[in-house]
Curated annotation (Swiss-Prot):
GO biological process, one term: lactate metabolic process
Organism: Bacillus cereus (strain ATCC 14579 / DSM 31 / CCUG 7414 / JCM 2152 / NBRC 15305 / NCIMB 9373 / NCTC 2599 / NRRL B-3711)
Function description: Is involved in L-lactate degradation and allows cells to grow with lactate as the sole carbon source.
Name used for this protein in its record: Lactate utilization protein A
Family: Belongs to the LutA/YkgE family.
An annotated Gene Ontology molecular function: oxidoreductase activity
GO cellular component: cytosol
One Pfam entry name: CCG
Organism domain of life: Bacteria
HAMAP family: LutA
InterPro entries, per database record: Cys_rich_dom, LutA
Length: 239
């Protein structure tokens, strides 16, 4: 099975280990990975900031780059959601709307692909300790991926998963929201960190690097002893 990887901006610039883990897990599951070097940003930051025409140019480039893929997989629920929004963005342009739909139909978030397409629930990972899961907004509310991360983590040997209080609450990142509405964002992430600490977890695990960088940065500034990990890193662990 051929998988074309969209690594995302944050993985490319800040969390390259997440990209490596994503590839290694998928290859271990029998996938052949392709990485088009022409890939750029999915256009979400520009689109959410109101720069629609600039965003469309990036989106058209991404459609051209990925439309011949068999499956498109990304370690980000937020970016996968943006791919699924492409047909709506181009709703007044039938030609591009059709091409956008073709791309959207074969785009999956990393854990969604493993559980729903590969039909795998245990990847053979092991990581001793206690974890809690942050469920990112776009991934759960818009993409509809709610159970896949928990299913996979429940089968990681040695790992105990505890429910995160107020799990439905946003961490305050929201892309450019954290820059434009900083005081509100800071209050939101403080509340998220309080919830994490309440669980007594050794690890905070999530599927979106934006959320994890936001929460992890706050945890570090507050001097808390919790390790933040992307789920791809956890599923690639053999401790």
């Amino acid at each position: 099975m051929k998988v074309t990887l969209f690594v995302t901006c944050l993985v490319d610039m800040f969390e390259t280990n997440v990209g490596k883990a994503t590839v290694e897990v998928l290859e271990r599951l029998g996938c052949e990975i392709e990485f088009p070097e022409a890939q750029v940003c999915c256009g979400q930051p520009a689109y959410n900031s109101g720069h629609v025409e600039a965003a469309k140019e990036a989106m058209k480039h991404m459609i051209e780059t990925f439309e011949d893929a068999e499956y498109i997989v990304t370690p980000s629920g937020s970016c996968a959601t943006m791919f699924h929004e492409y047909p709506h963005v181009f709703k007044d342009d039938p030609k591009w709307a059709k091409r956008a739909q073709k791309v959207a139909d074969k785009t999956y978030e990393f854990t969604q692909f493993i559980v729903d397409v590969l039909k795998v629930t245990d990847v053979g990972a092991s990581l001793p300790g206690i974890a809690t899961i942050h469920k990112s907004c776009h991934m759960t509310r818009m993409l509809g991926v709610k159970e896949a991360p928990g299913i996979l983590l429940s089968n990681v040997k040695g790992l105990t998963v505890r429910d995160l209080p107020n799990v439905q609450n946003c961490c305050g990142f929201g892309g450019t929201f954290s820059v434009k509405m900083t005081p509100i964002s800071e209050q939101m992430v403080d509340e998220k960190v309080d919830s994490v600490m309440e669980t007594g977890a050794d690890y905070l695990i999530g599927a979106d690097c934006g959320c994890l960088l936001n929460i992890g940065g706050r945890i570090e500034r507050l001097g808390k002893e919790v390790k933040v990990m992307h789920i791809a890193e956890v599923l690639n662990s053999r401790s």
